[in-house]
């Protein structure tokens, strides 16, 4: 990271930023092309490591790319706001507040029904703040759930 003065390294502070984010952009490599998709997500923390959970249709480009090459990049951000810190009539008089997390990891499908249910519970809890969901078994069977085991991540904040 070029701006070390903006880097957040404390795992608790990084996860506090993740907690404020509600959309994660996943980047896939598709035969030399880049495919990026914004997704709602949930996460699970184990010390300084994270697992991100997502859901979607069982077929489509995401699922094909996970099967083909599980390596992914991700980005999430929160608190974006452009404001003036100087002369309001000069473009360079503006800057932006934000907090962001970027990283890489390996994506895989979740097949086990209990893990799938737990992953959806985590995702829904992060998205709407509620736990103890009832899942219709037909819907559970119809949805694809996948996870990204985060291998590297960095966090940046600018106030």
How should these model regions be labeled?
Residues 2-5, 80-159:
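Charged, gly/pro-rich active-site loop segments
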Residues 21-58:
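Short beta-strand segments
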């Amino acid at each position: 990271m070029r701006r070390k003065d903006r880097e957040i390294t404390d795992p608790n502070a990084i996860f506090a930023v993740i907690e404020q984010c509600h959309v994660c952009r996943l980047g896939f490599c598709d035969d030399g092309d880049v495919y990026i998709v914004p997704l709602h997500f949930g996460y699970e923390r184990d010390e300084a490591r994270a697992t991100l959970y997502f859901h979607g249709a069982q077929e489509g480009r995401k699922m094909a790319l996970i099967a083909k090459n599980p390596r992914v990049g991700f980005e999430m951000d929160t608190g974006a706001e452009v404001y003036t810190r100087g002369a309001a009539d000069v473009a360079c008089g503006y800057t932006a507040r934000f907090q962001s997390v970027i990283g890489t990891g390996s994506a895989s499908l979740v097949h086990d029904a209990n893990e799938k249910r737990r992953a959806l519970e985590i995702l829904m809890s992060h998205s709407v703040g509620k736990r103890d969901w009832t899942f219709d078994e037909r819907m559970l069977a119809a949805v694809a759930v996948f996870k990204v085991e985060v291998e590297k991540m960095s966090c940046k904040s600018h106030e």
